Amino acid sequence: MQRIILFISIMSIIFSESGHNHNHSHENEFGIAIGVVPGHDDEGDNIGLHLHYVKGIGEHNDFGIGISIETIFDEHKHNSVSILGTYHFENGFTIAYAPGMLFEEHDGETEREFTQHFELYYEFELEHFHVGPQIDIGFDDNETHYMLGLHFGVDF
């Protein structure tokens, strides 16, 4: 039932905004996403937090590059720092790829390993702010996780 509601919500967003022209002329963005990370590391659901800064590049700032920090509030103190590349589509969707370093605590020691994240979010624009749904998928050596949440950005 939850998947059906999620699917209907996503399709509703896609078709309700298909005629809306999005403006990505801003040169900088500070964004935050908060969401649920289901079943991470065989635990129950956890809260995830994602912060990023992106500098727009190109004629209309459709592309961007920046830095990203992610944390999952779980028993293992899952934290990552990544370089972030983004592309803004004219229909309001943004995709991002973020390779970086994961820091995770196990048995009192901090382990480091390569991580990568793929993100997809939709922007409802409100002057210099935007808000919308986001999905974030993370791949590490030992596991894959995803976060379903809400993205909020400030454009300047």
Residues covered by each model-derived region:
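Cleavable N-terminal export/targeting peptides
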Residues: 1-26, 156
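Short glycine/proline- and aromatic-enriched beta-strand/turn motifs that initiate or cap beta-hairpins
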Residues: 17-71
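Residues that define the transmembrane beta-barrel architecture of outer-membrane proteins
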Residues: 26-28, 43-49, 77-81, 103, ...
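Repeated loop/turn-to-beta-strand initiation elements of outer-membrane beta-barrel proteins
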Residues: 28, 59-65, 92-95, 123-132
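Transmembrane beta-barrel strands of outer-membrane/channel proteins
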Residues: 32-38, 65-71, 83-85, 97-101, ...
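Gram-negative outer-membrane beta-barrel proteins
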Residues: 38-42, 59, 71-77, 91, ...
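Residue-level signature of outer-membrane beta-barrel architecture
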Residues: 55, 85-87, 122-124, 137, ...
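Outer-membrane beta-barrel "beta-signal"
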Residues: 118-124, 144-156
